[in-house]
Amino acid sequence: MNFANVILSKSKPVRNPDRSDESIWTSDECAKYYLCLDGEVFEFHCSQDLLFDVNRQLCDKRQNVHNCELTTETLVSKPLLDMATCANDTHLGCADGTCLPAEYFCDGSLDCDDMSDEGWCDVHYDPNAAERCDPKLCQLPDCFCSKNGTETPGNLVPSQTPQMITLTIDGPVNHENWDAYANQLFTGDRRNPNGCPIKATFFVSHQYTNYRHVQKLWNDGHEIAINSITLRGPEEWWSKNATVEDWFDEMVGQANIINRFGRVRMEDFRGMRVPYLSVGWNRQFLMMQEFGFVYDATVVAPYVDPPYWPYTLDYKMPHRCSGNNQYCPTRSYAGLWEMVINPLKHNNHVCATLEYCPSNFTRDDVYSVLLNNFKRHYLKNRAPFGIHLNAAWLKNNDYLLAIKRFVNELLKLPDVYFVTYREVIDWIRRPTPVLQLRKFEPWQCKSRRFEESEIACPKPNTCKLPSKVLQHDKYMITCSSCPKTYPWLRNEFGFE
């Protein structure tokens, strides 16, 4: 079979089967891959310093690619599971008949010699997959699910249910966006019907973040959540390749950095969002459960009307796994909340967040998209409506003005509340009718007591720090003392 026929017979990217033995491990050859599109073979090339991993079907750093000699993807055999003749009833069979404990299958670690324990692990094949929702067993305050995912907690009718709106912002907090936060959106004069200032949830990443500003946001009552240390690429790394240890290093590591240099208390870190909305399958959620995270805010649901309510992961998700690079959890993670993202619809276009909507949006486009999608929530089941923003997206002044206009208009309604994810979960755990919300304790705006070191300082330290990993000096602003080196993975406190 010649070169073209090999490519045409495959539906996924492959390497050149006719490449010479001498060139197999060269950077140039290992970075190439070929794909058949409409009966024609096209050559592609990974970006500079990246190689193509034929098994993972992505470009990655040289040190992570170990299969330059392979021409096509290695197919993993299907495990025998309960078809194997295992002597122990709690064991299942690998493809080669080897019996292992059932919990070893689809746990993120390779245990079968033939790798079959991790090769067939979507929701249809995982032998340890979560069961379908059972509302009789899943009871508030610790568990919430419904058959189709759209039912209101506490069986409240829409007119009794507050329309919660969640403003969430991903990325670094610094001088480039501080004016938008402190002087444009959260000035203190925009207030919910109970008299409390509107609040947002900030998913903070590490590089370029001013930790004094993070500390001030926390002092002002906003929720601080985690968005990783590195924001590394490629996007598929998070969903396909990150180990449980990687998840711990990235997310718990960032919590440690914010705690040390932004003084945010560890018990206040409730949730996280994965970069690029690349859900990390069971490995991500195993780490979250072990560390004590309360919620994830990464999963994008399909567009439905009425929209989905948040749910706990005690049972199977009420919708299919949607969006790019989404490898949703298949197992049960009791008590862990999924603050599901309901996508936005604009004409025939569906986008997970405003950042993924058409780049030629005008100020009026942004406003109309938000208003039309808000009505789908407000006039139906009143599932929380999310305005999910990216720090870079807000640099567009027209977009910022559209957001401000939308917020101002909605605050005229007597049953609309701009709240944090933590406050959404507080309400779902104790569904409270609109007319009783002025006395709903979790939403009160009582002054919080801070230690002197927890209060954002007027004159923070600007630290110039060496970084062996990044190979150049980095600046970091903090009210705490400067560390010796730039904080990074496995060196969160900058000791080394």
Regions found by a protein language model. Give the residues of each.
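Cysteine-rich, disulfide-bonded extracellular modules and peptides in secreted proteins
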Residues: 1-104, 108-122
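N-linked glycosylation sites
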Residues: 64-67, 88, 148, 241, ...
